[in-house]
Swiss-Prot record:
Lineage: Bacteria, Bacillati, Actinomycetota, Actinomycetes, Glycomycetales
Residues noted as binding 1D-myo-inositol 2-(L-cysteinylamino)-2-deoxy-alpha-D-glucopyranoside in the record, renumbered to the chain: E36, D186, K227, E238, Y276
Source organism of the structure: Stackebrandtia nassauensis (strain DSM 44728 / CIP 108903 / NRRL B-16338 / NBRC 102104 / LLR-40K-21)
UniProt similarity note: Belongs to the acetyltransferase family. MshD subfamily.
GO biological process, one term: mycothiol biosynthetic process
InterPro entries: Acyl_CoA_acyltransferase (IPR016181), Bact_Acetyltransf (IPR050832), GNAT_dom (IPR000182), Mycothiol_AcTrfase (IPR017813)
Residues of the N-acetyltransferase domain: 5-157, 159-306
The organism's place on the tree of life at top rank: Bacteria
Reactions listed under catalytic activity: 1D-myo-inositol 2-(L-cysteinylamino)-2-deoxy-alpha-D-glucopyranoside + acetyl-CoA = mycothiol + CoA + H(+)
Protein name: Mycothiol acetyltransferase
């Protein structure tokens, strides 16, 4: 019988074990089984603000071979991510984790359970079907090569694009982010703490966080947060977050910020850029496809009523 251990909080040593497990999975699968926010919460203690649980499976030697993260929101929905070590798959560990997650969420009187399958792995689909989950949301990673012709968008008169200044621009960035993504399930509702956690990450570079500022009053109307994954020849750039304040729609700031960000990434010596977009966002998919992006990987969010 597979034993699933459940913890409200993880000590530093256990967090290190989870991150090692994530790295092992990423080496085998080419992508992380946990999203960025989950990893940030693990590293910086964000789970203290998110009620939920950590579920762990160990082998006979005590080595961590399975992990699941469960977070509860204020609407009674339990969000889950899980992974099993590549050498321990197809042995019932995923089944055991998911059964324990459903039991935990039901006991917490959640009305629904959602789970991300990063990479849309066939095993995830089998588990989802077996437990009556349905596909609820599909996220594409799209990529393209950077070229000299990376867009011709320029800011309108009276608007300057400049780099973020740590310690000065956090509040303004937060305001425009939450206005631009008011209805977005992941990006909306940020706090200063969400920005601070990212500022502490090794990848953070204020030069690559570009703000569109109105000259007359310094109002930030939009931003393009770029990100660089990896190093050396394997490094790849990302259009991490691109947001424009509702009142600035129609000024073509999106095009101007995109161009500025791609130029910045190319200046870093990168030749490939990626981004994430919802499959259901037909307008954005059409825009990115027209800009030369093609689908690279697919993440699927499965949903189950409890």
């Amino acid at each position: 019988m597979i034993r699933v251990e459940i913890y409200e909080r993880l000590e530093a040593a256990a967090v290190a074990e989870v991150l090692e497990l994530v790295e092992a999975g990423a080496r085998a699968d080419g992508l992380s089984a946990l999203n960025e926010q989950t990893i940030l919460n693990l590293r910086h203690g964000g789970a203290e603000a998110e009620p939920g649980a950590h579920l762990m499976i160990r082998d006979a030697e005590g080595t961590l071979v399975g992990y699941a993260n469960l977070e509860l929101d204020n609407d009674g929905v339990a969000a889950v991510e899980m992974l099993v070590h590549p050498t321990h798959r197809h042995n019932g560990h995923g089944e055991a984790l998911l059964a324990a997650l459903i039991k935990r969420a039901t006991a917490a009187k959640c009305r629904a359970l959602t789970i991300w399958a990063h990479g849309d792995h066939p095993t995830a689909l089998l588990l989802a079907d077996r437990h009556d989950f349905t596909r609820d949301r599909v996220l594409w990673q799209m990529r393209r090569h950077l070229t000299d012709a990376d867009g011709d968008g320029e800011p309108a008169a009276g608007i300057t694009i400049r780099s973020f200044v740590p310690g000065r621009d956090e509040t303004r960035l937060l305001e425009v982010n939450n206005a631009a993504f008011a209805d977005h399930p992941d990006q909306g509702g940020w706090t200063v703490r969400d920005i601070a956690m990212r500022e502490r990450e090794d990848w953070f570079d204020p030069e690559g966080l570009l703000l569109a500022e109105r000259d007359v009053d310094g109002q930030v109307l939009g931003f393009h947060w770029t990100k660089v994954h990896g190093s050396g020849d394997s490094a790849i750039g990302e259009i991490y977050v691109l947001g424009v304040a509702p009142e600035a729609q129609g000024l073509k700031l999106g095009a101007a910020l995109t161009t500025a960000g791609l130029r910045y990434l190319r200046g870093r010596g990168l030749d490939t850029v990626m981004l994430y977009v919802d499959e259901s966002n037909v307008r954005a998919v059409r825009l990115y496809t027209g800009a030369g992006f093609t689908r690279w990987t697919t993440d699927v969010n499965y949903h189950k009523k409890l």
